[in-house]
From Swiss-Prot:
GO terms for cellular component: collagen trimer; low-density lipoprotein particle; plasma membrane. One of its GO terms (molecular function) is scavenger receptor activity. This is Macrophage scavenger receptor types I and II. SMART domains: SR. Residues 316-325 have a biased composition (Gly residues). Glycans are attached at residues 94, 107, 147, 188, 253, 271. Residues 357-457 form the SRCR domain. The keyword Flavoprotein does not apply. It comes from Mus musculus (Mouse). PANTHER family: MACROPHAGE SCAVENGER RECEPTOR TYPES I AND II, SRCR DOMAIN-CONTAINING PROTEIN.
Length: 458
């Protein structure tokens, strides 16, 4: 063993130095790697620990691989050398046995002794070869480790640069996130302000709309009252016109009577002049006397004899239109006339709209109880707030020009079926009764004894 150690030291005097150099290079690499790490980062200690553990794991892995491979290679090479040496000795012995005679067998013992010595030398040589191969492998390993350490240093430097850039980018992103959070906070504040403003505006708008609706309802009531007053004024005007017409008739009669009396007086005066004598001579014009007091009216004289019928006077003012007379009896149907020529073919007309209002129970189609068609059924209208304007709308919707009168208390008889409407408020300009202001369809607080009716101009 001492020989082997001396031989190893002799053959490999620099092996210990290489090991020291390799350890120093490892220390230097570790120092350089630790020195190149950033100190000012927040995640510095954990990253350095990770890199140190990574280095230790790599070094242990390489040492384990070298420790396993080197003995295997040495054993294989030793077995190959032994096998070759044995083959060579056997071949030499065979050749010597065949070539030499029996006389030389005494030298075989010497040869065997030499062979054993040679074998021992061969073993020593094998051990030296193994030590050389081991030292060579160590040298190769140290070079590879240095190269690997350099490559790892470069990679680590690149990784550190990338980490620095990542850290700077993360810091920038953090700053941008802080700015974004601040802007979001300001936006939240502005949104809260906007919500408060919108709520206040909504409250104001609701109040203003409520006030406007109240004002509109008041205006509608006023308009309704004014229209009712106007309608009542129109009715009073019609009554006044009728009274004026009657007064005019009375005045015409009085004027006729006065004319007749005037004519009678003129006739009496004519008769008196016939009885008197001839006129005397005209005397001198006397002084004008004082105006006397007006005497009392004289007693009416006796009515004289009616005179001769006078000339026809001027045409007087036309009198008022009298009430319509009773309808006459229908006349006899006349004989049919000759058949006329065939007329031209007319164009296709549009579909006539279905009537939703009708008059029932009157003397004709122009008057009767007002019935309205709704939900597939005919029903009546209650007479609450039923006035001339609603009748005007009904008459116009049926094709008549004006309304003559409106009727309440089932004037044309009580209807059947549902009572659809109540308290209908119309302005008189609507096209149909459905366009008037209607509270609801279907009335339960009214009976058919209050059905409304109307009379239109025929």
């Amino acid at each position: 063993m001492t020989k082997e150690m001396t031989e190893n030291q002799r053959l490999c005097p620099h092996e210990q130095e290489d090991a020291d150099c390799s350890s120093e290079s490892v220390k230097f690499d570790a120092r350089s790697m630790t020195a190149s790490l950033p100190h000012s980062t927040k995640n510095g200690p954990s990253l350095q620990e990770k890199l140190k553990s990574f280095k230790a794991a790599l070094i242990a892995l390489y040492l384990l691989v070298f420790a396993v491979l080197i003995p295997v290679v040495g054993i294989v090479t030793a077995q190959l050398l032994n096998w070759e040496m044995k083959n060579c000795l056997v071949c030499s012995l065979n050749t010597s046995d065949t070539s030499q005679g029996p006389m030389e067998k005494e030298n075989t013992s010497k040869v065997e002794m030499r062979f054993t010595i040679i074998m021992e030398h061969m073993k020593d040589m094998e051990e030296r070869i193994e030590s050389i191969s081991n030292s060579k492998a160590d040298l190769i390993d140290t070079e590879r480790f240095q190269n690997f350490s350099m490559a790892t240093d470069q990679r680590l430097n690149d990784i550190l640069l990338q980490l620095n850039s990542l850290i700077s980018s993360v810091q920038e992103h953090g700053n941008s996130l802080d700015a974004i959070s601040k802007s979001l906070q300001s936006l939240n504040m502005t949104l809260l302000d906007v919500q408060l403003h919108t709520e206040t505006l909504n409250v104001r708008v609701r109040e203003s709309t409520a006030k406007q609706q109240e004002d509109i309802s008041k205006l509608e009531e006023r308009v309704y009252k004014v229209s009712a007053e106007v309608q009542s004024v129109k009715e009073e005007q019609a009554h006044v016109e009728q009274e004026v017409k009657q007064e005019v008739r009375v005045l015409n009669n009085i004027t006729n009577d006065l004319r007749l009396k005037d004519w009678e007086h003129s006739q009496t005066l004519k008769n008196i002049t016939f009885i008197q004598g001839p006129p005397g001579p005209q005397g001198e014009k006397g002084d004008r006397g004082l105006t006397g007091q007006t005497g009392p009216p004289g007693a009416p004289g006796i009515r004289g004899i009616p005179g001769v019928k006078g000339d026809r006077g001027q045409i007087g003012f036309p009198g008022g239109r009298g009430n319509p007379g009773a309808p006459g009896k229908p006349g006899r149907s006349g004989s049919p006339g000759p058949k006329g020529q065939k007329g031209e073919k007319g164009s296709v007309g549009g579909s006539t709209p279905l009537k939703t209002v009708r008059l029932v129970g009157g003397s004709g189609a122009h008057e009767g109880r007002v019935e309205i068609f709704h939900q597939g059924q005919w029903g009546t209208i209650c007479d609450d707030r039923w006035d001339i304007r609603a009748g005007q709308v009904v008459c116009r919707s049926l094709g008549y020009q004006e309304v003559l009168a409106v009727h309440k208390r089932a004037h044309f008889g009580q209807g059947t079926g549902p009572i659809w409407l109540n308290e209908v408020m119309c302005f008189g300009r609507e096209s149909s009764i459905e366009n008037c202001k209607i509270n609801q369809w279907g009335v339960l607080s009214c009976s058919h004894s209050e059905d409304a009716g109307v009379t239109c101009t025929s």
